[in-house]
């Protein structure tokens, strides 16, 4: 199974085991005082003892997340180019969207022509019923984890267990990185104090520390981050995930791989019948 997204916190940094130091306090869920601490060694920043998580996850998707659809569209367009031009997908591989929420990204990627599947232990599959991933299907070429890392208490465990579950050696994910000192509480929207669901934050060096710990290479460009056992040219990744290429990628890829929209529709009708 995929690792727990939220759970208990240890004393030291879960990324590098270094000491954590207090950096600021803020109110979460409009009622709980939370302390935030940072690791000077790797830059990992987290909420200390997030005891409010059960309350924060009464709904897996926060009601205030009005940008969910637009972000999925943007990420799917970038992923189409990454899978086709960077990983060389030509229609034979299978993919998993871990912690896939309602299934929106999986549906979009199948519409583009990729054989994508879904898994999420905290959310119901609303949009791609019948396309839940099972290890018996065989190893995935890659696994995605979109907007997951900021919810984790132990990112290393999540990476390891997700790759083991999927059989993949490449994990493509998104999370907003910060640069330099931890941003002031009032200056960074990504803390998302009102929802209480974002509890861990990363720098580029945090990702590099995780990669070294797990024996994986790290690549990052335009908000797309990759852990992989293969080296990925960041200059190519930057081009493929850039504005102009990512806008054209869905159209290009769909024409070459063939959309699964209608074939999935027919499959669902067969199951109903």
Predicted segments with their positions:
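Di-metal (Zn2+ and/or Mg2+/Mn2+) metal-binding site signature of metallo-dependent hydrolases
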Residues: 151-155
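Short, glycine-/aromatic-enriched active-site segment of Class I SAM-dependent methyltransferases
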Residues: 174-200, 205-206, 210-212
């Amino acid at each position: 199974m995929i690792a727990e997204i939220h759970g208990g916190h240890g004393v030291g940094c879960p990324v590098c085991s270094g000491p954590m130091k207090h950096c600021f306090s803020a109110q979460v869920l409009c009622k709980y005082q939370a302390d935030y601490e940072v690791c000077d060694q790797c830059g990992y920043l987290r909420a200390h003892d997030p005891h409010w998580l059960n309350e924060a996850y009464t709904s897996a998707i926060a009601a205030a997340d009005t940008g969910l659809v637009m972000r999925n569209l943007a990420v799917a367009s970038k992923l189409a180019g990454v899978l086709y031009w960077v990983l060389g997908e030509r229609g034979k591989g299978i993919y998993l969207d871990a912690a896939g929420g309602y299934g929106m990204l999986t549906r979009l990627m199948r519409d583009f022509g990729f054989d994508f599947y879904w898994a999420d232990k905290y959310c119901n599959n609303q949009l791609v019923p019948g396309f839940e991933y099972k290890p018996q299907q065989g190893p995935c070429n890659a696994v995605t984890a979109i907007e997951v890392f900021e919810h984790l208490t132990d990112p290393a465990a999540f990476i390891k267990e997700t790759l083991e579950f999927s059989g993949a050696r490449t994990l493509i994910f998104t999370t907003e990185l910060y640069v330099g000192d931890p941003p002031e509480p009032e200056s960074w929207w990504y803390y998302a104090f009102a929802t209480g669901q974002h509890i861990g934050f990363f720098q580029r060096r945090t990702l590099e520390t995780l990669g070294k710990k797990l024996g994986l290479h790290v690549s990052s460009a335009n908000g797309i981050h990759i852990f992989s056992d293969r080296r990925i040219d960041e200059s190519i990744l930057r081009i493929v995930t850039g504005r102009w290429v990512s806008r054209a990628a869905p159209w290009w890829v769909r024409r070459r791989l063939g959309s699964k929209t209608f074939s999935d529709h027919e499959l669902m009708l067969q199951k109903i019948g």
